[in-house]
Every structure is written in C-alpha cells, then in structure tokens.
Regions:
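Structural signal for the C-terminal ends of transmembrane alpha-helices
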Residues: 71-73, 119-123
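Hydrophobic, membrane-inserted alpha-helices
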Residues: 37-41, 63-69, 86-94, 110-116
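Intrinsic-disorder/low-complexity, polar/charged segments
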Residues: 14-17, 51, 123-124, 154-157, ...
Length: 169
C-alpha cells in the first residue's frame, strides 16, 4: 500500500501534460515543502502567540485550498492545480498581512507566486493576467495595508522568524 501511495504522489499520470512531466516530482516536493512550512509556522504561532486560534485557522483554511491544488496536480490536472495553489498562497499572504501586520518579507509571496506562474508551461493568455493580478493585489496591499495596525499583536521575534522563514523558503 505504501508503494502504491508513493507511486501516486511521485509519478506523473497519463493525463499530466507531457511538457510538465520532467518537473512533476520537483513540483510535488514543492507542495510537500510548503506543507511542512505551514506546520512549522503554525507551531511557532501556537507556542508564541496568546490569541493563536484565528491565525492558525486562517493558515489551515488557505492550506486546504493549496491542498486541493496539490490533489489536482497529483491526478493530472497540472495547470489547474498550480493556479489554485497559487491563488491559495495569495489569499494566505493577504490574510497574514492583515492579521499580523505588514512586513517586507511577507510581500515575497506575491512576487514568488507570480514568477512561479510565469515559469510553468501554462498558456500565456491564462498565466500572464493571473500573475499581473497578483502583483496588482500586492500593490493594493502595500497602499492600504503597509501603514495599518495588525489585528493581532505578536511578539517581534515571532514576526522575525516568520519573515526569515519566508525569505529562505
């Protein structure tokens, strides 16, 4: 059973686009790394923030959207899965900024996800408008959220660790 599950997650399906197949495992590992990062962020928030429940609930909600993207990618709907996962990541970044405050490290989510979309072999008429909208959302977030007070006050060290993990990850 473990071998079957391993094959399902690591081998591209026949419906997977041929030009995506060489990168299938790398994309799957990227999803896995993101899940590990989410759990690490949630553990840090749980251990250091008194009012942790809403922040973690938001993280898990957008994590589920990204998880559906992972599932779609795994079963062969590569472009739909990647687009959905990127939209979930943008939602997570925006909610993070609103809840714990603006940090220059958090805007990297917008830029990284836009670049990811541009790098994968999705039709240009699909990926370019989405990538540009991600940058537009970032610009709007900067204009309206960079000077706002966070909903939750978190320790500076927690914000710094989250920022550094975002830069590295």
């Amino acid at each position: 059973m473990f071998v079957q599950l391993f094959d399902i997650v690591t081998l591209p399906k026949p419906r997977h686009p041929k030009d995506w197949r060489p990168a299938f495992l790398a994309m799957q590992l990227g999803f896995l790394a993101g899940a590990i990062g989410l759990l690490g962020r949630d553990l840090l928030i749980f251990l250091t923030v008194d009012d942790w429940a809403p922040i973690i609930a938001m993280e898990l909600a957008f994590g589920m959207v990204i998880g559906v993207g992972f599932f779609l990618h795994t079963v062969g709907f590569a472009s739909s899965g990647v687009i959905l996962a990127c939209v979930g990541g943008i939602g997570s970044a925006t909610a993070f900024i609103m809840m714990i405050g603006w940090s220059t490290a958090f805007y990297l989510w917008y830029v990284n996800l836009a670049v990811l979309l541009l790098a994968v072999p999705i039709r240009n008429w699909i990926k370019w408008p989405i990538a540009v909208s991600f940058i537009g959302i970032y610009s709007i977030a900067h204009l309206f959220l960079s000077g706002s007070q966070p909903v939750f006050d978190i320790p500076a060290i927690t914000k710094d660790v989250l920022a550094i993990s975002n830069i590295i990850g």
